[in-house]
Every structure is written in structure tokens, then in C-alpha cells.
């Protein structure tokens, strides 16, 4: 049996009917059974606050654990006001505060997005 590849999808949108979360769900359906694809839930991740870094809230601890355990990341990034969606930026801020950005080290990251007009190109550029 092939080893399992663990991929974590992170959507920058908190909307229930998000196109970007839908894009992650579609990607999950396209993968073989040897790939474990989870989608992180950012809905309860509070705004980053440096004063809370020593006692991270449970949703933040869960996110850090998911990123750490993943072999690769897929970021689905909507574009809000010509830049990165706040929920995604906030999640990246929390995880990047770990010593030496350890959860991200050595991980391949794919970036995708769904949107009208210019799509999500400007947000992807900022990432």
C-alpha cells in the first residue's frame, strides 16, 4: 500500500457558500484515496494578538497542529479589496509566530482562487 500524503487546505473565506472553499472541496474529490485532504476551519480563529501568544486559544492550537502535521498546503485565496482575505492573513499570522516558523518549514504550498473579474491574481501576488 502506498504511504498516505497529508494535505491541508486553507480557505481564506468564512462564507458558508464560499467559491474558494468549494474549490478546495472539488480538489479533495479529485485526489486518489492515498491522499488525506483536510480543510481547516478558520471560523473560530480569533484575531491575532501578540499578547495571547503564550496561551494560544484552542482553535489556534488546532490550526498549528494541522499545519505541522500536513505534508503540503493548498491555500484557496479570495481577493478582498485587492489583497489577501483577512481570515487567511490572520491564520498565517498565528501559525508564523511559532518558533522559526517551524510548521511551514520545508512544506510545498499551492495557491489557487476563484473569483470574478481579475479572479484572485492580486491576492495571490501578495501571498
Predicted regions span which residues?
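Short, flexible hinge/linker loops that cap or flank conserved catalytic cores
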Residues: 1-2, 103
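N-terminal beta1-alpha1 ligand-phosphate binding loop
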Residues: 2-34
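A generic structural signal for short beta-strands and their flanking turns/coil linkers
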Residues: 33, 41, 105-108
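N-terminal beta-loop-helix "entrance" segment that forms/cooperates
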Residues: 42-59
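Helix-loop-strand module that forms the ligand-binding subsite of alpha/beta enzymes
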Residues: 57-127
Amino acid at each position: 500500500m502506498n504511504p498516505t500524503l497529508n494535505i491541508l487546505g486553507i480557505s481564506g473565506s468564512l462564507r458558508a457558500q464560499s467559491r474558494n472553499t468549494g474549490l478546495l472541496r472539488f480538489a479533495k474529490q479529485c485526489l486518489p484515496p492515498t491522499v488525506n485532504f483536510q480543510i481547516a476551519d478558520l471560523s473560530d480563529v480569533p484575531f491575532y494578538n501578540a499578547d495571547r501568544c503564550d496561551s494560544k486559544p484552542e482553535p489556534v492550537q488546532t490550526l498549528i497542529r494541522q499545519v505541522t502535521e500536513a505534508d503540503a498546503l493548498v491555500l484557496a485565496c479570495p481577493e478582498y479589496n485587492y489583497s489577501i482575505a483577512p481570515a487567511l492573513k490572520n491564520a498565517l499570522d498565528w501559525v508564523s509566530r511559532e518558533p522559526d516558523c517551524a510548521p511551514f518549514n520545508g512544506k510545498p504550498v499551492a495557491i489557487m482562487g476563484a473569483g470574478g473579474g481579475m479572479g484572485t491574481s492580486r491576492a495571490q501576488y501578495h501571498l
